[in-house]
């Protein structure tokens, strides 16, 4: 699957088709900009836990923040919206790639 750039928009294919209602999706996100040292990871963790989204978030050495998360489409879209609403002024770009959900996560964690 080719990687594409998306600024605050869910990529095509993230949205559920008619036969997939209730099935979990997975997205892999790289946020760039001034996204470290502003409470991004802790806010992402709180938003994910509130919405029932599972996965993890971590700072990368190159200054980006990486997020892998799974959940129902509506919850993932609310998660993306929450991050955009709070950190939109800090985010220069967001690369969002849909992936196949694995169900491997029991919660949402901050990786250090």
Spans of features found by a protein language model:
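Intrinsically disordered, low-complexity, mixed-charge
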Residues: 2-112
């Amino acid at each position: 699957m080719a990687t594409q750039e998306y600024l605050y928009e869910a990529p095509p294919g993230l949205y559920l088709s008619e036969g997939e209602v209730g099935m979990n999706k997975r997205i892999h996100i790289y946020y760039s900009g001034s996204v470290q040292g502003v409470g991004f990871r802790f806010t992402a963790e709180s938003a994910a836990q509130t919405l029932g989204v599972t996965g993890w978030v971590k700072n990368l050495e190159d200054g980006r923040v990486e997020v892998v998360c799974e959940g129902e489409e509506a919850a993932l879209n609310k998660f993306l919206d929450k991050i955009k609403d709070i950190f939109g002024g800090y985010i220069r770009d967001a690369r969002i790639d849909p992936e196949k959900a694995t169900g491997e996560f029991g919660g949402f964690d901050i990786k250090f």
